[in-house]
């Protein structure tokens, strides 16, 4: 039985993780739950259902309410709570289902204790990939990707000779704006952007999908996750989102992972690997006609892929800078302060003018994060 701490349990990934746990109760025990958002009612229901021994929240009102209603549970507040949840002695696996870098210190401390990291938070590797990889190597920490694309690549690479790998290919649905003209893109609304044709996700990641920044961040994540220095990492548009990742080998053979567009598949794999169990979710119905289309990314319309390649060339502080600047620009769009087309325009300008520095500690990461947020708010 695996003993889990779920960081970000009330978000989309967190709730789907608990759905998998609910379907396979004999395999898991939830030791700790941490919530970042305002989804208080959902969090209370999770506490009642899964009876964790540790919970963490980010607002004082919830802290006092939980302490009163659940007197036998250890309740923590803020970053202290994340650390307590992630490093609890009974926990052997951390599900990093939060967004942003707020959980980064807790994740690193858990890795130092040898706990397995089931990672859904791409910002962690984008901002601190070099640090995370060094800690994973030093402490022999296992990292299992939950992102559907990286989980697919992980499955394709498992047991393979990585020196024979030629290319890693991440697939992109193309987002809600795939078929809009350049003229239409200048007039898109928040409502247009948040209507994703395939995936049901949070607002921030849905905006990132529309700009393909999400795919750019995933290219960076794949670099740090798999460490294949001699393999090319690319992205292709695949509107059906049935194939999630492909590995091309030196002999031209391509392996892929194929399943319906649901995060339940990679979550269950990450939680149960190397074993496989019956799933509550259905696979692809091959008795029905299926279409698979692949298009190259239009990098003129979507410079985000080029920005990701820039980060991989420059490394250092460029990753945390790109990540934090994008977060601010997306938030400015969601509050109707800037237009959708401004996100990529401003992000490109910020990256063009940024002078990369070394980034070898968490203090460095958070300093760059702060600088990027300030610049992205002003531009």
From Swiss-Prot:
The keyword S-adenosyl-L-methionine does not apply. It is an enzyme of class 1 (oxidoreductase). It holds the Pfam family DXP_redisom_C. NADPH binds at residues 10-13, 39, 121, 123, 202. The keyword Oxidoreductase applies. It comes from the Bacteria. Its cofactor is Mg(2+); Mn(2+). GO terms for molecular function: 1-deoxy-D-xylulose-5-phosphate reductoisomerase activity; manganese ion binding; NADPH binding. Pathway: Isoprenoid biosynthesis; isopentenyl diphosphate biosynthesis via DXP pathway; isopentenyl diphosphate from 1-deoxy-D-xylulose 5-phosphate: step 1/6. Its EC number is 1.1.1.267. Mn(2+) binds at residues 147, 149, 218. 1-deoxy-D-xylulose 5-phosphate binds at residues 122, 148-149, 173, 196, 209, 214-215, 218. Keywords: Isoprene biosynthesis, Manganese, Metal-binding, NADP, Oxidoreductase. It catalyses: 2-C-methyl-D-erythritol 4-phosphate + NADP(+) = 1-deoxy-D-xylulose 5-phosphate + NADPH + H(+). GO terms for biological process: isopentenyl diphosphate biosynthetic process, methylerythritol 4-phosphate pathway involved in terpenoid biosynthetic process. Belongs to the DXR family. Catalyzes the NADPH-dependent rearrangement and reduction of 1-deoxy-D-xylulose-5-phosphate (DXP) to 2-C-methyl-D-erythritol 4-phosphate (MEP). PANTHER family: 1-DEOXY-D-XYLULOSE 5-PHOSPHATE REDUCTOISOMERASE, 1-DEOXY-D-XYLULOSE 5-PHOSPHATE REDUCTOISOMERASE, CHLOROPLASTIC. This is 1-deoxy-D-xylulose 5-phosphate reductoisomerase.
């Amino acid at each position: 039985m695996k003993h889990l701490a779920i960081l970000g349990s009330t978000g989309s990934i967190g709730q789907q993780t608990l759905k998998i746990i609910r379907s396979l109760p004999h395999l898991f025990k939830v030791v700790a739950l941490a919530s970042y958002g305002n989804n208080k009612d959902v969090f209370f229901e999770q506490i009642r259902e899964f009876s964790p021994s540790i919970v963490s929240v980010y607002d004082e009102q919830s802290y006092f309410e939980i302490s009163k209603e659940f007197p036998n549970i250890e309740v923590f507040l803020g970053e202290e709570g994340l650390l307590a949840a992630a490093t609890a002695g009974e926990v052997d696996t951390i599900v990093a289902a939060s967004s942003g870098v707020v959980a980064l210190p807790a994740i690193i401390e858990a890795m130092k204790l040898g706990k397995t990291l089931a990672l859904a938070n791409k910002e962690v590797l984008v901002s601190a990939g070099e640090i995370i990889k060094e800690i994973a190597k030093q402490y022999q920490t296992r990292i299992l990707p939950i992102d559907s694309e990286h989980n697919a690549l992980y499955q394709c690479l498992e047991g393979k000779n990585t020196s024979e790998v030629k290319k890693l290919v991440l697939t992109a649905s193309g987002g809600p704006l795939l078929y809009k003209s350049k003229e239409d893109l200048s007039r898109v609304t928040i409502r247009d952007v948040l209507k994703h044709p395939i995936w049901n996700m949070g607002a921030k990641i849905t905006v990132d999908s529309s700009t393909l920044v999400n795919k750019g961040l995933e290219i960076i994540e794949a670099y740090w996750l798999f460490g294949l220095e001699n393999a090319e990492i690319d992205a292709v548009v695949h509107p059906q989102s049935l194939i999630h990742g492909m590995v091309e080998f030196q002999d031209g053979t391509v392996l892929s992972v194929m399943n319906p567009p649901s995060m339940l598949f990679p979550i269950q794999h990450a939680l149960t690997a190397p074993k496989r169990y019956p799933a509550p979710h259905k696979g692809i119905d091959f008795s029905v006609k299926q279409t698979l289309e692949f298009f190259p990314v239009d990098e003129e319309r979507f410079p985000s892929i080029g920005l990701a390649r820039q980060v991989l060339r420059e490394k250092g502080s460029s990753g945390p800078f790109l990540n934090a600047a994008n977060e601010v620009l997306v938030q400015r769009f969601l509050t109707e302060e800037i237009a959708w087309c401004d996100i990529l325009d401003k992000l490109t300008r910020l990256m063009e003018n940024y002078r990369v520095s070394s980034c070898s500690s968490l203090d460095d990461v958070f300093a760059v994060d702060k600088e990027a947020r300030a610049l992205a708010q002003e531009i």
